[in-house]
Amino acid sequence: MSGNDARARVRSLPSTSSPLETRDSDEQESSSSQSQRGSRKRGPQRRATELPSAADLYVPSLPGLPDMATHPTHPLNIYAGMLPSYPGEGKVGGEGETGKDAKLYFLMAKARRNAGKERVIFWFNGGPGCSSFDGSLMEVGPFRTVPASETTTGMVEAKLVEGGWEEFATVVFVDQPPGTGYSYAATNGYLHDFDELSAHFIEFLQNFYTVFPELKGVDTYLAGESFAGQYIPFFADALINSAELPNFPLKGIAIGNGWIDPKEQYPGYVEFAYEKGLIDSGTPVSAAFVDLHKERADQMLTDQEAEEMEAALKRCQEEMDKYTDPFTTPVNIDHCGEVMDSVTRPFTQELNGKKVCMNVYDVRLVDDFPACGMNWPPDLPDVYTFLRQDEVISALHASSKETAWVECNNKVSYELNLKHSHMSAALLPSILEAGVPILMFAGAEDLICNYKGIERIVNGLEWGGEKGFANATSQEWYLNGTQVGTWQTSRGLSYAKIFDSSHMVGFDVPHVTNDMIMRFMDVDVSLLPGMISQWSSRIGDDERTMIHVGDAGEAGGVPLIKGGNTDWEAWYNAVFAFLVLGILVSIVGLYFYFRRKPVSYRSRIALKQRGRHRQSHDRDEGDTAERMPLGSERLELDDIERAEGYEFDDRDDEGYSGKGKGKGKELADDREEVMFALGDDDEDDRH
């Protein structure tokens, strides 16, 4: 198998071998010839002369959210639009037609609370060529979509959800490289290598800080998933060594289920398959897999299938052995795509008259063949519809993009041929040695960029005079008393394995990833006076509290809405102090008043409960898709997520290209099967 990816799709591209791919794009643009490359040195940057103002980019409302800034429980300030990224003629990323007139699109959610200081996170999805709206609408952002069937307008609308990373940091979701999502690239202007992408990101940042100067100098983090495991280290290296943005306040990078080091991750497929029991020569499918896929309980994985997998790995290893220098090791290695194919092939079969296959992003699920995960996650059809509605396009200042939004643009992926690029893993030691912490996190149920491959990377990495985590042990990670994963840290590098989660961890367990990023950024919630309702988070002996995100009215505390505005904080603090003083005065008054009453009368007096702590199971109906159970209860998918979805060919006229836009179906029970339950994993997953 060959191709690139990040949110990872399974499709073939010529001349590369990767476990990754991208969704087909409906954008029809003529192929561009490879442009001549001039000097690779980056010279002084050409500054953009015409930029929009912050006011021009403000997004006051979206369908379903008429006035986000004054929302009663979750006020939100959103900015969105395009900014130039073309670094200038003759510069890296600007040779010939390459990158000419390119613009990168972004959506920024300002921080809702300020715990001591401001923080900014730039988020990237992978692909290459996959839009960061995956992140903002389905993972770590403040929004989820509401199906048209559930709205009074008959349109797909947006709703606000808790657990987003904008709770304590301003999050900027960037569509890049140019041409991705709402971003713009001229027909012959697509980028080809990572140094070009870095140059465009640096130029974008300079323009971004011109429009939002208050964010320049703020502690900054880069984060993303999948193929962003290639982008992010290159961007970090460029910022550390940038002449255009000297002393850049880069405080860390976070990569989820990233494609980083092919030499470690291709063998990781085989280790993952054996550990999960997906391939166990001569024995039935593992008990865990049988529980989720009862119809397959009688299938035997033969010795021959295991031998084919080992043979594929051997052929791959012969190719990998040709590369001994990480700075010449390519992102994808020929003949190695066969390794993952050999793992998934036995799970492609006829079932109830339909050909199905494993969902490579969540091995607990299956999907219609040949989608194998492309029909997932279940929100995707509504995301497509939402981002193609005229009202949304106008509100998000995306009208200048002539072609319709697509999740992943194949033209971007194809043109990014990486002929002059090496794997990003080569840069990790120098990033760590520059004092920039790195967090790698992995959903335990993802195959395509699985945790075994990530663990091989961190265990083989050498920096600071030592290899891997040395003597640092893996510690259990608990949220409200439930183990949600494991965490390991040494010399600036952290690795988090997250249970019950897929390739898109934030989609499955948003509150866990919220706790994770708060820990990584060292957010101190004790600096939020008046925040009464809290959750506990513990890694080993390190126990902390995190703000309980929920309905402030039901929580019985002060409103949990601060947005980082010091005037609002002062107002809330004053109100809180006034209320406490009033309650104390009332209690003292009642005490002296009732001392003069008969005891029998006093015994009937009790202070009325003003509210209740809202537990994780106290949810509004319909919220379960976005809310992670933090106790022992199970989280079931609602009827919408259980729906069959669209068939492969029923949306071609809308640009879906016959790929299908539904959910990878669980086979155990169409309506009653549990998607995941914290505390119910196999024991093997917890070590």
Curated annotation (Swiss-Prot):
Region feature Disordered, mapped onto this chain: 1-55, 610-671
Q: Which GO terms describe its molecular function?
A: serine-type carboxypeptidase activity
Q: Which spans does this entry mark as compositional bias, Acidic residues?
A: 646-655
List the keywords (alphabetical): Apoptosis, Carboxypeptidase, Glycoprotein, Golgi apparatus, Hydrolase, Membrane, Protease, Signal, Transmembrane, Transmembrane helix
Record carries keyword Transcription regulation:
no
Q: Name one GO biological process term.
A: apoptotic process
Q: Which residues are glycosylated?
A: 471, 480
Provide the reaction this enzyme catalyses.
Answer: Preferential release of a C-terminal arginine or lysine residue
Biased region (Basic and acidic residues) positions are 617-626, 633-645
The entry's active site is 226, 446, 503
Supply the EC number(s): 3.4.16.6
Cellular component terms, GO, for this chain's entry?
membrane; trans-Golgi network
Give the source's domain of life in one word. Answer: Eukaryota
Q: Where are the transmembrane segments?
A: 574-594
Topology, Cytoplasmic side: 595-687
Enzyme category, top tier:
hydrolase
Give the membrane topology.
Single-pass type I membrane protein
Q: Where in the cell is it found?
A: Golgi apparatus, trans-Golgi network membrane
Q: Which family does it belong to?
A: Belongs to the peptidase S10 family.
In UniProt terms, what function does this protein have? Protease with a carboxypeptidase B-like function involved in the C-terminal processing of the lysine and arginine residues from protein precursors. Promotes cell fusion and is involved in the programmed cell death.
Question: What is the name attached to this protein's record?
Answer: Pheromone-processing carboxypeptidase KEX1
